[in-house]
A protein has these predicted regions:
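Active-site neighborhoods and metal-handling regions in enzymes and metal-associated proteins
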Residues: 1-132
Length: 132
C-alpha cells in the first residue's frame, strides 16, 4: 500500500491526467495480486466539500493543475482481516507537489488495534473530564 502511495506521489504535477495516477497506484496493487481487495479510487479533490473533483480514478478526465488539493489514499480491504490505507492531502505545486500530511509510515504507527483504539478513546475522555 505504501509503495502504491509512492507511485502516485511520483506522478503528481500540473498537466498529469488523474486517471494515469490511479493506474500507477492501483495498477501496482493489482500487479501484486491485490486487485480483488480494491474498493475505491486512489484519491479525490478538496474544495467546498471534502470529496469532489478532480477525481484520481480510472476513467477520470480530470487533469491536475497548480494549486489543486488532492488526496492520495490507495487502499486494500481484506475480508475478515481489515483495511490498509494511508490518506494524504497533497498540494499540486508548479514543479510537483507538497504533501501536507505529516504522519509516520512505519507499521507500528499505522496499526490500529481494538486495544489501542480504546486506550485512545479512554485517554481523550479523561483529558476532557479534567479539563486538559
Amino acid at each position: 500500500m505504501l509503495e502504491a502511495r509512492q507511485r502516485a506521489f511520483a506522478m503528481i504535477r500540473p498537466g498529469t491526467a488523474c486517471a494515469d495516477i490511479d493506474r500507477a497506484a492501483n495498477g501496482f496493487l493489482r500487479q501484486e495480486g491485490m486487485g480483488e481487495y480494491l474498493l475505491h479510487r486512489t484519491g479525490h479533490g478538496f474544495g467546498l466539500s471534502n470529496h469532489e473533483g478532480p477525481w484520481v480514478a480510472d476513467g477520470s478526465q480530470d487533469v491536475l493543475a497548480e494549486n489543486m488539493l488532492v488526496s492520495v489514499e490507495p487502499g486494500i480491504y481484506i475480508p475478515n482481516l481489515g483495511g490498509f490505507r494511508h490518506s494524504d492531502t497533497v498540494l499540486v505545486t508548479r514543479d510537483g507537489y507538497e504533501c501536507l500530511t505529516h504522519y509516520p509510515t512505519d507499521l507500528n504507527s499505522l496499526t490500529v488495534s481494538t486495544g489501542k483504539l480504546f486506550t485512545r478513546i479512554r485517554g481523550a475522555l479523561v483529558r476532557k473530564a479534567v479539563g486538559i
